[in-house]
Amino acid sequence: MDTIELYEIDSDYIKYLSSFEQHLFRNKKVTQVFTRKYIGIVLKINGFDYFVPLSSFKEKHKRLCETKDFIKVGTFSVINLNNMFPAPINLCKKVIIADLKDIHYRNLVRSEYRIIRQKTQLILQNAKAVYEHKMINDGKSKLSQRCNNFKLLEEKCKLYAKKI
């Protein structure tokens, strides 16, 4: 993967995976009328395409330092690598920033993307380190407890991919 790109993930796949993993975020709360886009980046890890979702920047993020699994994208969003999950690439739709209708949202996404590109190496290194840490220390450290169950989700990803 030469350049990092932004993707939107299929909401049915999120619904499917979230029944197996408590750390997986849904893109719509029960009280919401509209779903928000589940946007992130895709990285190749252990032979799988891993979707790494972007999360909205919150007030608490201002005082947090970056760690192996937590990367700030300016003051626009954050990347929680512990929340990444495997996804069939055909369920990931590339985000074309120029096609985004809302100018404010387009500018936000453009700014996020610029910073993500600048941090590509850090993101790739940390993602692989988080993955390896989880596989080696499953449940034995705070970091591994925060992580999705990558092994389980890889199995569920394979099963889902066979059905599509």
Q: What do the PLM-derived regions correspond to, one by one?
A:
Residues 1, 8-34:
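An N-terminal domain-cap segment
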Residues 1-2, 164:
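Intrinsically disordered, low-complexity and often Lys/Arg-enriched segments
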Residues 10, 55, 88:
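Residues at the C-termini of beta-strands that transition into short coil/loop
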Residues 13, 58, 91:
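Residue-level detector of flexible, active-site-proximal loop/helix-junction positions
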Residues 29-33, 44-80:
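Compact nucleic-acid interaction/catalytic patches
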Residues 72-164:
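C-terminal terminal-subdomain/extension
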